[in-house]
Structure formats: structure tokens, C-alpha cells
């Protein structure tokens, strides 16, 4: 075998083990008995040790050194780019530190869940302090003399810096605040009332997953506390949650996660269990979930279809017509929870977390002061006070499991989705007629061809520019939100 073939065989086994780690994580969130947490933490730490050893195996460096990348085709060069980046990053982090992070974050997830249930941030603060210290140590190893937060960002959005995000978000925040203020002055649409059987919600939500092209022969939809997607290639799983008085939470969580899942399912099978067999970045991943959920799923055309589906599932639920239903689905409402926020306000939740986590990593904010800082920023941005920790600083799992640098990719995904949506609609003039019939094939097909099939072949910015014909920027998102909510609220 050639050095390249040897390297790719090694990568395939490593990717397979990584998928096993993902299945353990999925099980931890969905099926695992509560009493198994300590053992699962040990299992995941052991597997992380094996993965770290493989990722830092000196043979990888030898293979990389002996391969002439110039002699490879585009796909081969991209594989080498990913492998080299991952090897260099993994080699900078001591194995003992990687294993400790895996163990501590696995245990921290349980501590966070208990503290959240008790609305007690003080009970979680020591654990969060330990997680942040470990992640900061990892970031310092990765950054060398560079910016620690920037080094952390590379795990989720290669090529992006905190300063670039700060500039983009700085342009976005005042526009969102201005539009939000105008909407709050306008007459609000009615709210959904009544109760909706949770079993019927799950039945309809699985139908919606299929409507959006999710392949249930290679996936499944289950319930979890925090909706997420897991896996790649031939095994891609999504979760959702139900609320008897808010079926939209279930349906749109599912559509969102199906956007992630469809991305993974639609990557070229040629890339299966290789570095290219995954999304280009978390921001690009989020662009798919957001465009499925919002630009497609919350469009006037598609909500007309969903209205009919809900009437079939639940009977008369007190909404007179499809136009009223559309307004209810897109109602701008006060609320504390990021994952339940409407399109207009969602990014304000993310920008707050971006600023707070940067301050935590730079030591400008201490964990002891985090809850107060959160509450102050929330009241400044939203105009009302956080009522309890589970609705505030404890609502998200991310920091407990060490996902520092992840939050900004949510808004970056919305920015990317804005660019993609403009290009998609320009190329599909009959799209709304299709969506009104529940036919998403043209939209999902366009995204599959333009974005999803390529997996990690291109760098994130390159993916968006090739697909949309423009460099990533916030202007299309601002145009989309201004037009949509201006129309909805008569601004």
C-alpha cells in the first residue's frame, strides 16, 4: 500500500471509533439509566484515550511527511488538509489532559442537569470553574502565543477569529434591536392555546422529518431534554422534545435537527468514515438546520401545509385559517429560553453568550460573577429580568460539556442561511408553490447539491461563497428578517 492508502485506512478506523463515542453520547442523553453516569464517564474517558493515541500516532506524522499532496486530486488534498490540521491540534494537547477533559465534562453534564433542576447555580459553579480551567489549559496549548479563544473557535469554525465575529455581530446587534423595538410597539398576533397530545406530537413530528427528506432507514427520532443530532453517514439520529401546550417546540426542534441530520445523510458516500465525511464546520451545519427550520419551515407557504397537518392530527385547535396560523407560528414573544426564541430575537441570545464566554476565557469575568453578569446583560437586551437560574445561566448544556466557542456558530449559521436563502429563492422561483403542498424536494435538493454533498471538501467560507455567489455577510439575514417581520407586523 502507498503512504496515502495507509493513512486513509488508519483514518477510517479512527473515524469509526469516533462514531462509537458519538453513540455513547447519544445513549447518555436518551436511554442511559441515571445511575450509569459514573461508569459512562469512565467508558468515554477510556475511549477518548484510545482516540487521542490514534490521532497523535507518530505514524500519522510519518505518512503526512512522505505524501506529496501536490500529486493528489482535489479530494485527496482536502483529506490531507483535514488530517494535518487534526493531527497538529491533537499533538499539542497532552493525552492526560484530553482524557481528564473527557472525564470531567461527562460528569459535569450530570451535575449541570441536577443544578438546573434545582435552580441552583452555586451548586454548579465549582464544576464549571474546573471545566473552564481545563478548557483554558487546552486552549493555551493550542494557541501557543496566540489568542486562546481564537484557538478554541477552530474546533467549530476553522479560519474564523473572535475579532471577525465581533465585527459581524456588532453590525447585526443594533439592527436586531431596532427591529425588535418596532415589533414590540406593533399589535401582536394571537397565541396558540389548548393542549396537544404528546404521543400525537411525536407521530406528526416523525412525519415532518420524512417530509424534509430525512431517511428513517438510516436514522431515528427520539425524545431528549435538549434536542440534538448525532452521527454521520449511514447512522444519523435526531432528538426532539414535547410540551403539551406548545407543539411548535416539538415540530420545529425536529425540523431543525433534521436539517443537521440531512446534511450528514447527504454527504457523498465516497467520503464515508473519512475526514471529509462530516460537515464543513458547525456554522455551515447550523446554516442547514436554520434554513430548514426558518426560511423553509416557518415560511407562509409551508405553514399553510403544516396547518392542515395539525388539523388532521389534533382536530379543530382554535385557529381559524392558514394566515392566522402563519402569524402565530412567527409571533415575537417574550421568553427566556434560547432554543424557544423566535427568529427575530434568537441571535440576541447568542450574542450575549458569545460575549460572556469570551470574558470567562480571558479572565475578565469570573464564574462567581457569571450569573449576575448574565442577568444584567439579559435585562439590558430584552427589557425584563431573569426569574430563575434554569431560565438563565443554567439553561444550556454547552459550557458543562466544554463546548467553548460553539455558541457563536449558531448566529454564524443564521448569517450563512441568509446568504443561501437569497440564492436558493433566486434559483427556484416556484418554491413557494411546492412548499404549500408540503413538497420540500426542490429546496432540500438545492441544498444537497450546493452544500451538503460536499461534506468537508471546502473550507466554511468557501462553501457559502460557492453556493450563494457572495462572501458570508450579515446583510441578507437583516434583509430577510426586516422584510418578513415588517410584513407580519405592518411596519
For each feature predicted by the language model, list its residue ranges:
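Secondary-structure capping and boundary motifs in well-ordered enzyme cores
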Residues: 39, 97-100, 127, 197, ...
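All-alpha helical catalytic cores of prenyl diphosphate-utilizing isoprenoid enzymes
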Residues: 169, 173-176, 198-202, 208-222, ...
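C-terminal, non-catalytic "cap/extension" segments appended to globular domains
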Residues: 3, 19-25, 35, 39, ...
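A well-structured
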Residues: 1-158, 482-491
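Contiguous, non-catalytic segments that form substrate-binding/exosite surfaces or channel walls
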Residues: 101-249
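A conserved active-site cap/scaffold subdomain adjacent to cofactor or substrate pockets
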Residues: 258, 265, 276-365
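Divalent metal-coordination and catalytic microenvironments
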Residues: 7, 143, 256, 289, ...
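Short alpha-helix carrying the canonical HExxH Zn2+-binding catalytic motif
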Residues: 246-262
Amino acid at each position: 500500500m502507498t503512504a496515502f492508502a495507509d493513512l486513509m485506512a488508519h483514518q477510517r478506523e479512527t473515524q469509526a471509533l469516533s462514531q462509537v463515542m458519538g453513540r455513547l453520547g447519544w445513549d447518555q442523553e436518551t436511554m442511559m439509566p441515571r445511575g450509569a453516569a459514573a461508569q459512562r464517564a469512565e467508558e468515554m474517558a477510556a475511549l477518548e484515550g484510545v482516540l487521542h493515541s490514534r490521532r497523535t500516532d507518530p505514524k500519522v506524522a510519518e505518512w503526512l511527511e512522505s505524501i506529496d499532496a501536490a500529486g493528489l486530486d482535489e479530494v485527496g488534498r482536502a483529506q490531507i488538509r483535514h488530517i494535518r490540521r487534526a493531527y497538529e491540534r491533537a499533538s499539542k494537547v497532552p493525552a492526560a489532559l484530553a482524557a481528564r477533559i473527557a472525564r470531567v465534562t461527562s460528569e459535569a453534564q450530570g451535575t449541570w442537569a441536577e443544578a438546573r433542576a434545582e435552580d441552583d447555580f452555586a451548586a454548579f459553579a465549582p464544576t464549571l470553574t474546573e471545566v473552564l480551567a481545563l478548557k483554558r489549559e487546552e486552549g493555551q496549548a493550542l494557541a501557543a502565543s496566540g489568542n486562546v479563544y481564537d484557538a478554541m473557535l477552530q474546533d467549530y469554525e476553522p479560519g474564523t477569529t473572535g475579532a471577525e465575529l465581533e465585527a459581524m455581530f456588532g453590525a447585526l446587534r443594533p439592527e436586531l434591536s431596532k427591529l425588535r423595538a418596532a415589533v414590540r410597539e406593533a399589535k401582536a398576533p394571537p397565541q396558540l392555546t389548548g393542549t396537544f397530545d404528546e404521543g400525537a406530537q411525536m407521530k406528526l413530528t416523525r412525519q415532518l422529518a420524512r417530509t424534509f427528506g430525512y431517511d428513517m432507514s438510516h436514522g431515528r427520532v427520539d425524545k431528549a431534554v435538549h434536542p440534538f443530532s448525532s452521527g454521520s453517514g449511514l447512522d444519523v439520529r435526531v432528538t426532539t422534545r414535547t410540551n403539551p401546550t406548545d407543539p411548535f417546540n416539538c415540530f420545529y426542534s425536529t425540523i431543525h435537527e433534521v436539517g443537521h441530520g440531512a446534511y450528514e445523510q447527504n454527504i457523498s458516500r465516497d467520503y464515508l468514515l473519512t475526514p471529509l465525511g462530516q460537515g464543513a464546520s458547525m456554522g455551515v451545519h447550523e446554516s442547514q438546520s436554520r434554513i430548514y427550520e426558518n426560511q423553509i419551515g416557518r415560511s407562509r407557504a409551508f405553514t399553510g401545509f403544516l396547518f392542515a397537518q395539525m388539523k388532521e392530527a389534533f382536530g379543530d385547535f382554535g385557529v381559524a385559517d392558514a394566515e392566522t396560523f402563519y402569524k402565530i407560528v412567527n409571533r415575537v414573544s417574550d421568553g427566556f429560553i434560547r432554543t424557544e426564541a423566535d427568529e427575530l430575537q434568537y441571535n440576541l441570545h447568542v450574542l450575549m453568550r458569545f460575549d460572556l464566554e469570551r470574558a470567562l476565557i480571558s479572565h475578565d469575568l469570573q464564574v462567581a460573577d457569571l450569573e449576575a453578569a448574565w442577568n444584567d446583560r439579559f435585562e439590558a437586551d430584552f427589557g425584563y429580568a431573569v426569574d430563575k437560574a434554569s431560565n438563565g445561566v443554567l439553561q444550556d448544556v454547552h459550557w458543562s460539556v466544554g463546548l467553548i466557542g460553539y455558541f457563536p456558530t449558531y448566529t454564524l449559521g443564521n448569517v450563512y442561511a441568509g446568504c443561501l436563502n437569497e440564492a436558493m429563492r433566486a434559483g427556484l422561483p416556484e418554491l413557494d408553490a411546492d412548499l404549500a403542498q408540503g413538497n420540500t424536494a426542490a429546496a432540500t435538493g438545492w441544498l444537497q447539491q450546493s452544500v451538503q454533498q460536499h461534506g468537508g471538501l471546502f473550507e466554511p467560507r468557501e462553501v457559502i461563497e460557492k453556493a450563494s455567489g457572495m462572501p458570508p455577510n450579515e446583510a441578507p439575514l437583516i434583509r430577510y428578517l426586516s422584510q418578513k417581520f415588517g410584513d407580519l407586523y405592518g411596519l
